[in-house]
Regions:
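Catalytic-domain carbohydrate-binding cleft regions of carbohydrate-active enzymes
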Residues: 4-311
Length: 311
């Protein structure tokens, strides 16, 4: 997908319509990750609540298209599930678009829309102290419990720059079990000397593992997904199989593709196999979506994933 700013499903604001009652997501049995290779594909839209635009635009445009684009996809693709973070954004949805918010609550109740991230906002975790991070989780999940009758148990920071060694400990003490980000690679910041193509994990430089256990300063741990690719990734081929070779007979194309594959395209079955061989857990984690102004994954990705999961 790349850093797509607008998906094919975005449109002018329209009135909320009553959802069809047959849209409940199918809940498959949980796989045995010690035996069954599994790739978790996380549909997501990143939204910078404040960045290079004024706050009213977030309310009038970005939040509405996040809701309505995904509502349209839910009605067309019964296995599609969407994740969106930030209790503060949900608070704004409820205040300014109560009819849309009621429809969103229906999709939450049927397992189609997941209030993710456990926090009020996807905030920085370098400058704030431990209490500030804990309060993000306390207030965020309390809001989710009050409105949706459920809470998240993972911390999702795809777009934050840097994470302290104490973070797993802070998250674990706050009841959080999982963490994910796309911001560790040298593409974004100076990277530590871990990972790399010659490492056992075969990860990009700066990423110690794809999915594994991150231990904090007091020995507490969280499950961490550290290489899910960009939140702006598309699904362009059957990702249950190896990535297709580039067209044409020129072998240099294959070499260039392999060099550029770290952020946009992966051999997911191979990644799952490597992780299983190293850790005993045959699983991996893949962001698919858009940013930085909300919205939804593009429809072609959702359509292809629907075909892959139902074949």
């Amino acid at each position: 997908m790349g850093q797509t700013q607008r998906s094919s499903q975005q449109s002018k604001p329209r009135a909320a319509a009553a959802p069809k009652r047959e849209t409940k997501a199918t809940s498959p049995a949980r796989p045995d990750l010690a035996k069954q290779p599994t790739l978790y594909v996380v549909g997501y839209a990143h939204l910078d609540t404040e960045w290079r635009w004024e706050y009213p635009q977030v309310i009038s445009e970005y939040l509405t298209k996040t809701m309505r684009n995904n509502f349209a996809l839910f009605e067309k693709y019964p296995h599609y599930i969407f994740n969106f973070t930030g209790a503060n954004r949900y608070r704004l949805m409820k205040e300014y678009y109560p009819a849309d918010f009621e429809r969103l609550k229906f999709y939450v109740s049927t397992g189609r829309w997941f209030p993710a991230g456990s926090s009020m906002e996807e905030g920085d975790v370098n400058s704030p102290n431990a209490e500030s991070i804990i309060r993000q989780i306390l207030y965020g999940n309390n809001w989710f419990r009050k409105e949706f009758g459920m809470a998240s148990d993972e911390y999702m920071l795809p777009d934050c720059f840097g994470f302290p060694a104490s973070l797993p400990s802070i998250l674990a003490h706050a009841g959080i079990k999982g963490f994910s980000t796309q911001k560790l690679s040298s593409a974004w910041q100076p990277a530590p000397h871990v990972g790399g193509p010659d490492s056992p994990e075969k990860t990009p430089v700066g990423i110690p593992f794809n999915v594994g256990i991150w231990e904090g300063t007091d020995g507490r741990t969280v499950i961490a997904a550290l290489n899910p690719l960009s939140y702006g990734s598309n699904v362009q081929y059957d990702i249950s199989k190896a990535a297709p070779p580039p067209p044409g007979p020129d072998p240099s194309l294959s070499e260039q593709q392999n060099q550029q594959r770290t952020r946009r395209q992966e051999d997911w079955p191979q990644r799952v196999q490597i992780n299983g061989n190293l850790t005993g857990v045959f699983a991996d984690y893949h962001y698919v979506g858009t940013g930085d102004v909300g919205g939804s994954p593009n429809e072609s990705s959702v359509k292809l994933m629907e075909a892959i999961t139902t074949k």
